[in-house]
Amino acid sequence: MSSTSLLLSSTKPVIYQTAKKNALQLISSFSKGSVNKSTHYPLLTKKSIVDGMKDSINNRGRFLGQGKSSLCGPASFFFTLLKIRPDIYVQLIIDIYSNGKTTLKDLKLESSQSAKNLKPVSLREVDWLLLSSIKPKYDHPDEQFDGITLPGKLKKWFIDAGFTDVVDNTNLISNKGLETLLKAQNDYSSGYTICLFVDADIFYPFKYKSGSSFFPNHWVVMNSDVKIRKYNEKTKKHKPASIITQPIISSIKKQISDIETAAFLDDEDDVSTETYDRILLDAFTWGKQSVPVTSKISSTQEARLSYFLNGFYGYIKVKR
């Protein structure tokens, strides 16, 4: 039985600080150990792996990133693991670097031979080693299509890894609405990790934004509550941000109905874009722990709720 299997076999809950302490001890032992160079990853240095693990543990995943690859699904999976069990995250990396492969319960992790012989440019060596290991047919960061992760695959990874409460609430064809967004918030408040399935445009910096959303192409992990700033018709200003609730949704739906009626009557004054509600939401993505939803309207403007919903295709919730 591997060290990773032993870590997973315990049924007692592990406190994060204890897991972090164990992770740092594992890193220290590995750095002083006899393995100085991996025969499986000849171009990845032990120092880069050790430094990468330390950065991820001490910053709780801040630097765990996909670079220019399409490995957002694997990044979301391993970020979820890292933030609750950093000791398991570290043990996986050590096992893969030392032995070329490992298992996490029923999840087999081994990179393709081409991936093992590659020195990545657009992402850290430790991230390439780990993220490519869950995609056995993935050879290079530039291979965008092979790096794509569909909801069913991400769900299976979590189940195979031992997460016992995994629910898929996504849609590949049409975007989701307010009710699904409220469910995501409620699940987040209940302690679930929420992997949002979105059009990446809603998290892109303003200068890289495109137009309308036609399909989901990105996974991110929620790192904040979903908050809404309602527009006050009387004061002509937005109200303070509040966590999304059913009453807020009911108010928004009424507002949408009123706007649609005004549009039908060609009353331009009543369909002013300034009445659009705003959404505030941060998520882990692209190696950064907290990236906010931003609008395509202005680089300094909070994102319109309607803009976010246009690129929101649901979520997967997980809990160990």
Place the predicted regions along the sequence by residue:
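Short, flexible beta-strand-to-coil junctions
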Residues: 135-143, 197-205, 226, 285-288
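Active-site-adjacent substructure of cysteine-protease-like catalytic cores
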Residues: 173-266
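Core alpha/beta structural scaffold of self-assembling particle/tube/pore-forming proteins
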Residues: 121-182
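Noncatalytic regulatory segments and standalone regulatory/sensor domains
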Residues: 227-320
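Active-site nucleophile-adjacent alpha helix/oxyanion-hole segment immediately C-terminal to the catalytic cysteine
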Residues: 7-141, 185-197, 291-294, 303, ...
